[in-house]
């Protein structure tokens, strides 16, 4: 369906892909993995034409319908939830079914998007994408804004769909349950593996172990040959053998063992001593449209406390942080 052929993508300080190739086959569900910054999102954007490769090509059938959900989305807020999902193109009853699965109550369907949190707006965008039933569904961290119940429904939807999928996710359990193949971005290449994430991890460990052993054997052989060259370089009766060994060394393609990821070390500077009470809110009220988020809310944080802010999506967690920081 989609053929990625010998693509190269470079930036001034970094090369993401160097003659990388892969093929997305019909009705496969592929998890795209790799360290942060290796080019996962860039690859999706190149497939849909929002970015271009410096060399190589990405070919797809001309009739292919691709649906793409990025990590962040600017959803038009003038629509109601229901309008944003069906867009006067798709059956309303199907839109309602998907909205229910994504955690929207019937009372929510005719509310304006602007009254919802960013997480719920992403759910609306996801709902529209699922309703559009593309040939290829590409998702970038789709579970970030889903709670447990909606994720169960979402996974069931994907498993019962015949769409071909290319999914970026750091949720390895989600990948284990959903994908049939893994593409790993590694050493500027796309490496394909059949199976889910756990199966890929086992194979990757085996390959890394084999590569480390091969690198060690090669290093010993190079050292042995180099020792011969150094010892007999200036001996006339060994000149032919020395030249042969030098050519042998020149032809060797160095095997590199996998290096462990770099560990970042940092520390926060000591802050200026604060008062005993760091933050205080009294009688706070916040409303979006007709939706009341807080009513007579009291909140305080004392010096030295470490507070976890939890709640359902749309409960007002981000709004509270914005109020505390003075943005709202």
Model-derived segments and spans:
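Intracellular alpha-helical coupling/juxtamembrane segments of multi-pass membrane proteins
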Residues: 203-258
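Short hinge/gating elements
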Residues: 230-232, 264-267
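ABC ATP-binding cassette signature C-motif
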Residues: 1-215, 262, 269-328
């Amino acid at each position: 369906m989609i053929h990625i052929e010998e693509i190269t993508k470079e930036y001034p300080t970094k090369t993401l892909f160097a003659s990388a190739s892969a093929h997305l086959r019909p009705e496969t569900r592929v998890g795209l993995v790799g360290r942060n910054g290796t080019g996962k999102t860039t690859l999706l954007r190149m497939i849909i034409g929002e970015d271009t490769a410096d060399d190589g090509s990405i070919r797809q059938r001309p009739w292919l319908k691709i649906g793409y959900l990025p990590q962040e989305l600017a959803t038009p807020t003038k629509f109601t939830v229901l309008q944003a999902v069906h867009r006067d193109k798709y059956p309303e009853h199907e839109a309602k079914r998907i909205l229910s699965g994504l955690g929207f109550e019937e009372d929510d369907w005719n509310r304006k998007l602007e009254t919802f949190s960013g997480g719920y707006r992403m759910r609306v965008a996801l709902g529209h994408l699922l309703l559009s039933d593309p040939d290829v569904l590409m998702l970038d961290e789709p579970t970030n804004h889903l709670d447990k119940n909606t994720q169960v429904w979402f996974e069931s939807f994907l498993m019962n769909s015949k769409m071909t999928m290319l999914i970026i996710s750091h949720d390895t359990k989600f990948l284990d349950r959903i994908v049939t193949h893994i593409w790993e971005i590694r050493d500027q290449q796309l490496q394909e593996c059949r199976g889910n994430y756990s199966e890929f991890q086992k194979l990757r460990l085996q390959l890394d172990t084999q590569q480390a052993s091969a690198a060690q054997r090669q290093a010993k052989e190079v050292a042995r040959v180099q020792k011969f060259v150094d010892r007999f370089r200036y001996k006339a009766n060994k000149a032919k053998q020395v030249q042969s060994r030098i050519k042998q060394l020149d032809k060797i393609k160095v095997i590199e063992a996998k290096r462990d990821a770099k560990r970042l070390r940092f520390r926060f500077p000591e802050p200026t001593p604060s008062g005993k009470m760091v933050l205080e809110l009294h009688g706070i009220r916040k409303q979006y449209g007709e939706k009341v988020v807080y009513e007579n809310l009291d909140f305080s944080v004392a010096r030295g406390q470490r507070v976890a802010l939890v709640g359902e999506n749309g409960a007002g967690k981000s709004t509270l942080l914005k109020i505390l920081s003075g943005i709202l």
